[in-house]
């Protein structure tokens, strides 16, 4: 350590006052040597009561032999203030490199913070740029300021004039300079306010560009005993350079050579950059840094040299250990320590063991940080890999999306052209299909109308002749009674009337301009119908004889099984129909398979739905495809003859292709909101039902059992696809009921007296035929039991037909017990499955009570016959047949009575 007496070193920077422990250090009367522009003067210890202020201008003047300026403070406070003031931007202080600095002789040893050559070299070796720091009064380093000093404001300069008056011992060598500085002093309060304002404005300014040689950042107020106002006043003159016409601030001496200063500053910057590069290279070579703080007995200094702490500093809170050096512009930690006076303790001067510990500790810290950095690098690498993978996936997805978009565009363009072509195609072919459909409908209507007209003409021929004959016979019988002679007379009258009517019905010869008889064809048709009637009568007689011999209800009677169709009409109808179907097969023959084949069209739309379902849905294709597929279905349904063929839709090609249209490929069922599931039902409703409706209304022969059976099958088929709420289906049911009502109204069953049947020829055959026709109609009505409601059937078959027209005929022939029993059996057989038979309960057979009463009437007739002594095999056979009728009607009690009455050996 050096001498213990207080040393006064020249200071540079915003340091505090010069009072240390109550003592005031004053400058010596004369300097010991002349320093360069970058080195401060050293003070002698011979004048303890005076202090010399150092400025760059003073130093230059000293080099040139100019007299120096001394300050004579009046009191301790003034001396403290004057020792801490700096020159403003007009000062020529510069930070030069170490080589340019000339050594100055000093009467003291280099202390901590001094500008000795050894200290600066050690500082350059171990320390990078250090932040701004404030040293204590004990250290008092010599600092060279550079940069511009913000000039004080005019009002501040005016207020500083009062300070000049308080400084009475200022002695400048040049009177002009003394007068200039006397005007630059201000009062203390104004200086404090200006200092606070500038410190607030310069907080964002960069750190000082000089190297502090203090022993660390020290709280000068606590160490030196400087007041808060003095501490706030320190560093007030740091700021931008004032303008040329501005007045100089406190201690602001004129700068007569600014260009030289700027050149020096630029060289300083270059030297600093070179020193920084050298320092960085040296640090990389060393591999480890120097610790600036070690343990509780060392503190961090601005020059990288550890300074021991005073014993009274041990009570301060322990600061976090800093790294080896502070970067330029980075503020130092707020560590307040008091450096000791004496030579600095360098890391290199420590024992080897301590240096090894420091190096080991630094190495461990570096390894720890390296591991942390490695972990962060690995984490960053992992995230980078993840991001790269995600990016690659995104790129792949985008490429796939782009390729899919391209495929979609191509597909949509082709599909647009396809739909455009197929719409035009269907518009052209649709007229041909409609023409063939109209011709097919016309053919069916003609075929049905020919049968109906022939039946009506035949009935009219018979009824006209029989009507006249019956009327003549009834006239004779009503006048003369029922004797055999009267019956013979009635027969003669009937024949005469019949012959007369036949002659009137014969068409006379009517020649046209070419000599052809226009009525010849009509007469031939009448003759053909008469011959057909004769054949039917002959068949009836044969069946009646067989019924007398055969004991059973299975034998049908005349009129019950006749279809009223001629072989010639049937063959002509089939020939014309086949030619129309051949024309239909050639409708699409001139088109390519892409448009003419339903399977190709279906596959095209199914691919659209499968690959681009959203666009398929947005285009409302579920509402459009029925219209597109409809021509193909209509063309195939031309072959569908629902009245003459019992064909299921499953046997048709269009149904097999469109039944699973739009169904998922995985075999799952349709989605609830997929309207393509209703494609086939919609086609059935819009295409098939209209065809069937036309056949029912215009072509159905209700008396034909075969056509009725096929019509029932076709109606049942369409009801399986279409809901009951369908309007088309409701219209179909209404048409069926209307046709049945019309048929019941058109039929008539004669109720002639038995005497008339005996007297008038052919009346029994006609009555039997009409009865057989009514039974046939009743049986055809009962075929609709699974389609029409039971009350509707009951009203049609029972109320209107059975009770209104059939039973009166049976009652009229009751005296002819054989015919009456036979016809009753046919009635019960026609109602089987609906109101009669083993599968029907008694509840359903109750509406047949009139038929039961008629059967009981026949039983009483047989009982009378048995009571008259006619107990023959015929009577027993009729009784047995009545018993079976009652069993079918669920009248078992009456059946048992017949068994007991006629001694039948049969169980009921």
From Swiss-Prot:
It is found in: Nucleus. Residues 25-47 have a biased composition (Low complexity). It comes from Arabidopsis thaliana. This is Transcriptional repressor ILP1. Keywords: Coiled coil, Nucleus, Repressor, Transcription, Transcription regulation. GO terms for biological process: DNA endoreduplication; mRNA splicing, via spliceosome; negative regulation of DNA-templated transcription. Interacts with STIPL1/NTR1. Disruption phenotype: Reduction of polyploidy and inhibition of hypocotyl elongation. Pfam families: GCFC. The C-terminal region (474-908) is responsible for the repressor activity. Transcriptional repressor regulating endoreduplication through control of A-type cyclins expression. Does not bind to promoter sequences (in vitro) and may act by interacting with tissue-specific transcription factors. Enhances the endocycle in endoreduplicating cells in seedlings. Required for efficient splicing. Residues 426-453 form a coiled coil. Residues 1-113, 238-277, 513-574 are annotated as: Disordered. Belongs to the GCF family. GO terms for cellular component: nucleus. Residues 513-530 have a biased composition (Basic and acidic residues).
